[in-house]
């Protein structure tokens, strides 16, 4: 049985800020503020995507920062009622496709050591555990697992995102 949710992946814009800020508060003990999210939207080295449900509501979102040929996934969050329905995977696959198309050397992320479902998702997408950041998270204090997916690259990467992540949609 297919349990995936039909969502549309689009670049995040200012119209999504309130919903994404609320999602941050629901999902994280130390959430990004609306102002932080707004600043990230304007950052030329960053891209943020939202997954919209059939009614146009934000079901989830993810962010990435790219410097030269390195990508860092900053955030992945999915509304509790939409978890385990393929939303995070769909968001991350857009970033994986972008990374390959722009010859990034790798994508990396951090995840709470206790977040087994997220780690299983990342492993399924080809990320591997490459280290730990001791006591990285607060509320509760916890280690971060550093996970990286490397790409086979031949040549120079040129991965300028532009504010808002133009071109990162499905």
Each model region followed by its residue ranges:
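Short acidic/glycine-enriched loop/turn segments that link adjacent beta-strands
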Residues: 45, 69, 115, 137-143
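Acyl-donor (CoA/ACP) binding surface of acyl/acetyltransferases
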Residues: 85, 134, 150-152
């Amino acid at each position: 049985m297919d349990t995936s949710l039909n969502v549309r992946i689009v670049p995040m814009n200012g119209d999504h800020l309130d919903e994404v800020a609320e999602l941050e508060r629901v999902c994280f003990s130390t959430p990004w503020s609306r102002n932080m999210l707004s600043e990230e939207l304007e950052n030329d080295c960053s891209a943020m995507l939202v997954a919209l449900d059939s009614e146009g509501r934000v079901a989830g979102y993810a962010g990435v920062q790219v410097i030269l040929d390195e990508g860092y996934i900053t955030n992945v969050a999915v509304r509790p009622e939409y978890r385990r329905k393929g939303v995070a995977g769909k968001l991350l696959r857009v970033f994986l496709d972008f990374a390959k198309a722009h010859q990034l050397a790798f994508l990396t992320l951090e995840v709470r050591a206790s977040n087994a479902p997220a780690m299983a998702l990342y492993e399924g997408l080809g990320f591997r555990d490459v280290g730990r950041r001791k006591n990285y998270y607060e509320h509760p204090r916890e280690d971060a697992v550093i996970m990286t997916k490397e790409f086979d690259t031949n040549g120079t990467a040129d991965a300028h995102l532009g504010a808002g992540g133009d071109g990162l949609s499905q």
